[in-house]
Amino acid sequence: MWERRRNFHLAVGLLLSGTAIALAAVAVGEQNQGGGKYAEGMHTAPPYWAYAVNPPAAKNDRKADVVDTSLRRVPNSEAAFTVLQTSDLFYVPDWHPGGHPPMPGIVAHGRKPKIFACGYCHLPNGFGRPENANLAGLPADYIAEQMSDFKNGLRKTSVPEFLPAVSMGKYEQLASEQEVREAAAYFTGIKPKPWIRVLETDSVPKTQVAGWMLVAWEPREMEPIGARIIETPENLERTELRDDTSGFIAYVPVGSIATGKALVTTGGEGKTVPCATCHGTGLQGMKDVPGIAGRSPSYVVRQIVDMQNGLRAGAGSQQMKSVVAKLNIEDMIAIAAYTASLNP
């Protein structure tokens, strides 16, 4: 395992966002099945694959004394950035500036020392990654409401070690109302596009946790999917370089899309309610209600679990309590698989 981990580090050779200097990776099978310590008093155990928690970086894995100053490039871009630039939380590597409006300061640079650039984690086009939200096209008032919920302790995570969510309530909530309005107006003005390829399958690549997401082992090995969603980058190097044109593939159990469609469109004989009632035709949103079509299925499952556990307690989330109360993990997987397969 250590040889595989070392080879993985050498193959990728990239600094990660957040806390680790070297790429920390570990086999999913070696993690506890919650992805980290649970929050107290939970109704639903959080699945590890939806709350991918970085393992501690081993001392032998650290490369603090190695500074890579070489320029990196991605397809269809004239830009070039160093690995250090692509790992700076207060700097957004803008590979495709023509693909989005000009970024306001809070999106492009954040505000030091604690408010990270919105566009670093959520990407310049807002499409985000499995560990965070896709903000593109969300209603501005909804984005502002979520920031208020983070600030007031009304939005938390079922896994306290899941830092992408924790940092929103600890650091990003320090943004001023003006900064929140600017960021919300920016992201709501971006048209969402397909970002996730959903594939039904019986077997999936074995994965490791790196950078708060699942990545495939190298060399690749396969295992049964079971009751899981395995969402992983289409191209790991481009994803770690923050390329906002390189998306993700979500492996889902065979039959889950059809099962999810039945739950979403009919309510599953009283198990839930038809999602279009609030989320609109095509689940693309309605008024201040967010669209859920084409969004990360890992993210969708996380939100349902957090709602069941009472950790999303804002006004909008309160309306969801009865909607998600009867769902089991298989239902969540099916719903997330179906919604992710839709055009955003």
For the regions a language model picked out, list residue spans one by one:
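Intrinsically disordered, low-complexity segments enriched in Gly and acidic/Ser/Thr residues
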Residues: G267, P274, G282-V289, S296-V301, ...
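Short cysteine/histidine-rich zinc-coordinating motifs and their immediately flanking basic loops
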Residues: R129-L135, K287-A293
